[in-house]
Amino acid sequence: MVRYMVTSALPYANGPIHAGHLAGAYLPADIFVRYLRLKGEDVVFICGTDEHGTPISFRALKEGRSPREIVDEFHEHIKITFQRAKISFDFFGRTELPIHYKLSQQFFLKAYENGHLVKKVTKQAYCEHDKMFLPDRFVIGTCPFCGAENQRGDQCEVCGRPLTPEILINPRCALCGRPISFRESAHYYIKMQDFAEKLKRWIENQPWKPNVKNMVLKWIEEGLEERAITRDLNWGIPVPLDEEDMKNKVLYVWFEAPIGYISITMEYFKRLGKPNEWKKYWLNIDSETRVIHFIGKDNIPFHAIFWPAFLMAYGKYKDEEVEAEWNLPYDIPANEYLTLEGKKFSTSRNWAIWVHEFLDVFPADYLRYYLTTIMPETRDSDFSFAEFKTRINEELVNNLGNFVHRAMTFVNRYFDGIVPERGELDELDRQALEEIEKAFEEVGELIMNYRFKDALKRVMELASFGNKYFDHKQPWKTAKEDRARTGTTVNISLQIVKALGILLEPFLPDASEKIWHLLNLDEVKKWKFKELPAGHRVRKAEILFKKVTDEQIIYFILNYMGRNNPEGAKMLLEKYYKREDVIKVAKEKFGEESKIILKRIYKDIKLEEGKEEKEMEYVKFEDFAKLDLRVGKIIEVKDHPNADKLYIVKVDLGKEVRTLVAGLKKYYKPEELLNKYVIIVANLEPKKLRGVESQGMLLAADDGENVALLMPDKEVKLGAKVR
């Protein structure tokens, strides 16, 4: 029996996941795995955070925090985001696991022992201002191949070619922006030319997507060169050699990150109490395992050339139980890029749809559905808010949801919720049953060929057929004159509903579960259709999907994009909506805060366009006296684990320490808040904000663009009352 080891690219633990990530490497893998599970296949689905990338060190330096704090925060954040998006990993690990350190060092040593590494002293990028060697991603400049500016020194985001700081035009430090110099430093390189012919022969025989196969064969034909696999960094996996010039150096993340697929699998089975089970999936013991890596376009060379070369460099794995070669990738179904309203996603400019924010407003199934319909399988595709709304409303609500609701309503209204007997079948009845069988066969074949857009389209065609079948049969008419015929129509309609409940599972797991609940089924879903028996009782009809409204989209743009990227939000709002409609939604959703939000986006807005200022309302002294305002000192600042814009702040009030949640992240760095004297409302009723209880409120001034904390102009006793 074939086994499947399915992986998704390890996301960097230095920031949240956006819709482009989801559409590229995670949603397609999840659809594929859910289908395999329905088929009863032996499949393990693995992922985890890549925690030693230079972006992590970069962010830690900029924020004055330790890399470990960064990766701990984002490992948990990314894990929760995937859970909310219904990505069903068997195990979501991390490369900070001890087992990963051990295995990565083992891979290095085996390549070293087998003669595939060479030490070279080369000139490395160095910043005289920051007094440090610069990893490739800390250097920016112009790509020598395509001329794109502001490209990092490891890979061009425009043409996809690998880069090094040495070949960049006008290289400079990404931290301070100053020109860099180059200093000599010893590093180990993997001799990629050792594997060129073997890789070429192997790749030529792989059934990969043309976009993947053509790219990597072209690279090999152009010649593979030695590539550094160690770095001058203090965060990462130490080089496992006792050599003076290897001290304070780590394994290059592009070398050790893919090893994480194996180490995370090891950790998964270790936690299951089966520490040797991983070998069935990663070692070529019986030629029955298919290792499938789902990745984005930018990861193709690393997974299709370098990663297989690392496995070859290791040679045979050997222990007391087994001696075998590593399984090379069976397939690498890489997707192209997703753009947003015609522009490339940009995390630095906050031109992105962050998944955790989107799921605050819209159900996971809506995001999964739309991303699948536009999945960039063979070419780049675009996320459009207008198309998102149209597809959800016309396809999910009006087609799929409508058919399920019609069938469920009718069986309850005319047959007391009991599946009726089926009478004599006519040609259309038989066609309906054939359509069910054909759908299972065709959808399954499309999924196995990674044609997820077409597979979902085929599922929706069955829902469309169900509506046409229902309309043609007109059971609302036959119910009055031919109950048996009506029973047949309802029976077959419910068979289609059940089929949809299974067929939707890989794509829309929540909708699939709702249909299963409506049909009152407790059987395990399988990719083999078994009819609902006559006499089975179903539940009352419920609405499966609700329409997406303009108000929801405006709210999302205002509340999330508007706070992070006001110019981008303005462009979107002006593209789709009248300003008065935006103002109306802002007033309804945000109240008084709407003025601040609108002013941030529309610089030219007049107050009367938003809301007239009320005359000042006086507060009675006895009401003001109820506030207990105290002086405190901030002694600790941490990122909120469940919110990007919030800090968790500890404030010393002299006799006690309070925990507060404060929305200051956009305006203050942690080090700017530490040891500051502040004013807090001490008798405010505690309230949980994103899962953390806030025991008071910091006082601050807000003019719509800037926020400034209120602070005493000289030190006073902690806990002193403000009068």
Swiss-Prot record:
PROSITE patterns per record: AA_TRNA_LIGASE_I, TRBD
Subcellular localization: Cytoplasm
Binding site for Zn(2+): C143, C146, C156, C159
Span(s) of short sequence motif 'KMSKS' region: 344-348
Predominant location category: cytoplasm
Enzyme Commission number(s): 6.1.1.10
Short sequence motif named 'HIGH' region, residue ranges: 11-21
Residue span(s) of domain tRNA-binding: 623-723
Reported cofactor(s): Zn(2+)
Top EC category: ligase
GO biological-process terms attached to the record: methionyl-tRNA aminoacylation
A Pfam family matched in the record: tRNA_bind
Listed InterPro entries: aa-tRNA-synth_I_CS, Anticodon_Met, Met-tRNA-synth_bsu_C, Met-tRNA_ligase_1, Met-tRNA_synth, Methionyl/Leucyl_tRNA_Synth, MetRS_core, MetRS_Zn
Residues that span the membrane, as ranges: none
Superkingdom of the source species: Archaea
Catalytic activity: tRNA(Met) + L-methionine + ATP = L-methionyl-tRNA(Met) + AMP + diphosphate
GO cellular component, one term: cytosol
GO-annotated molecular function: ATP binding; metal ion binding; methionine-tRNA ligase activity; tRNA binding
Keywords: Aminoacyl-tRNA synthetase, ATP-binding, Cytoplasm, Ligase, Metal-binding, Nucleotide-binding, Protein biosynthesis, RNA-binding, tRNA-binding, Zinc
Protein residues bound to ATP: T347
Note on how the cofactor is bound: Binds 1 zinc ion per subunit.
Family: Belongs to the class-I aminoacyl-tRNA synthetase family. MetG type 1 subfamily.
Subunit (UniProt): Homodimer.
Function: Is required not only for elongation of protein synthesis but also for the initiation of all mRNA translation through initiator tRNA(fMet) aminoacylation.
Record's protein name: Methionine--tRNA ligase
Upper lineage: Archaea, Methanobacteriati, Methanobacteriota, Thermococci, Thermococcales
